[in-house]
């Protein structure tokens, strides 16, 4: 489990995201070969440009308001919004202030190409339908094949209080805790998780996110290959 504490600098080869604090939460050094996650906390103003080469980035606005500027177009950013940028594109983040603009970014190789529609580059959580993932869980898709992302799926899920059966997925996933507290059960170990915690779940890893709070736990998930968050490779009785 990694926590999104502040660090300076910007990872990757695409150029600096200046005017911001950047924290790498998950990458190869943490055992994730394909997916990398970082949290960007933008101060008021505009960042420098970042260009993607052979990769794609799925952005999630955790808090704050601003704009995403890509290919001469401006896209408004607000909390609980997903956004999609692909190889060959250059983008900038602008924070109108006065509060921080906090963006959670997952980067992955571009493998199947893209069918991105620039007019649908951003996706509002409030506009997406609620889907079930078991009796006590629900989710909404953000960036997925509906907006032209063929390799990855991004979603926000709600986990009710309590512990569901241990289970596994065929996909490779990074989970980020937006809201709520609980316990991660993974590999025979238990770790406390809360807002800002980031978890890498390799394919077929048996796990459970137990919600120890009184309200729903809200999580951001991004996984490869693209698919259904409700699918299970295994579930205990």
What is each residue range found by the language model?
Residues 134-166, 170-173, 178-181:
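Surface-exposed interaction/gating patches
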Residues 19-26, 36-53, 153-169:
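Conserved short histidine dyad/triad with adjacent acidic residue
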């Amino acid at each position: 489990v990694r926590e999104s504490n502040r660090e300076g600098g910007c990872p990757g080869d695409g150029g600096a995201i200046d005017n911001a604090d950047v924290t790498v939460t998950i990458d190869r050094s943490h055992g994730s070969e394909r997916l990398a996650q970082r949290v960007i906390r933008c101060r008021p103003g505009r960042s420098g440009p970042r260009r993607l080469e052979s990769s794609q980035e799925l952005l999630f606005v955790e808090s704050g308001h601003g704009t995403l500027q890509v290919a001469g177009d401006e896209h408004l950013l607000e909390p609980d919004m997903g956004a999609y940028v692909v190889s060959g594109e250059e983008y900038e983040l602008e924070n109108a202030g006065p509060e921080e603009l906090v963006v959670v970014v997952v980067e992955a190789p571009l493998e199947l190409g893209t069918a991105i529609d620039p007019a649908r580059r951003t996706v509002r959580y409030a506009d997406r339908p609620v889907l079930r993932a078991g009796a006590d869980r629900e989710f909404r898709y953000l960036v997925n094949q509906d907006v032209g992302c063929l390799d990855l799926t991004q979603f926000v899920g709600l986990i009710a209080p309590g512990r569901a059966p241990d289970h596994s997925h065929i996909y490779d996933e990074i989970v980020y805790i937006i809201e709520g507290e609980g316990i991660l059960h993974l590999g025979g170990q238990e770790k406390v998780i809360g807002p800002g915690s980031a978890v890498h779940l390799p394919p077929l890893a048996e796990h459970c996110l137990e919600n120890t709070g009184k309200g729903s736990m809200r999580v951001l998930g991004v996984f490869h290959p693209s698919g259904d968050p409700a699918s299970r490779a295994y579930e205990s009785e």
